[in-house]
Amino acid sequence: MNRFLKSIGVFLIILFSITAVSAETLTSKLKRGDKLRLGFGTAVPWAYAGDNGQALGFVNMIALTVLEEMGITEDQTETKVFEWSGLIPGLNANRSDMVTGGMYILKSRCANMNFSDPIGVFGDAMMVPKGNPMGINNYADVVRTGAKLVTGAGFNTVEAAKKYGVPESQMMLVEGEVGILAAM
């Protein structure tokens, strides 16, 4: 765990050395009394907002703990909740200073932001109608059956599906988990 926290700390130090659009460092913003803007999407259990907008979820707790070890208190942070698909654009548009959320490290995302070391490895899962009438167990089955794959815009499953040959014509991209469930 200590090695893990050090890895997160290195990531955050790198983030703090990156200059914002105005070429002002995050450290100088904090010294001036401005708050660090922690952006996250609603991705339970990774990151979500509590009743008072506070950052909850295990990746938010890790980030806040590392920030505290760096001398940055929770009082020096403010939370910004984004739609999942708005996390990276919000960071790049300077609407947040850092983002959390249990995000997969994808080549396309690395072109737009820096990542910490991975904190876990997760696979994809598919939700199908009761009884799995089309026999869909993987991406190859989606291609074989011609089924429509519903996933979130900006989710890792878009790149994974393409990698396994699912054509864009068989994908429906929606906003987040609620949109996925509604499309089912």
Regions found by a protein language model. Give the residues of each.
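Bacterial N-terminal signal peptides that target proteins for export
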Residues: 1-9
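Bacterial N-terminal signal peptides
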Residues: 9-18
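Short, intrinsically disordered, charge-balanced linker/junction segments flanking boundaries
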Residues: 18-23, 176-184
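Extracytoplasmic small-molecule ligand-binding "clamshell" domains
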Residues: 24-101
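Bilobed "Venus flytrap"/periplasmic-binding protein-like clamshell domains
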Residues: 37, 42-44, 53-70, 125-181
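Glycine/Thr-rich phosphate-binding loops of Rossmann-like dinucleotide-binding domains
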Residues: 46-48, 109, 159
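Acidic, polar ligand-binding/catalytic clefts
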Residues: 64, 77-141
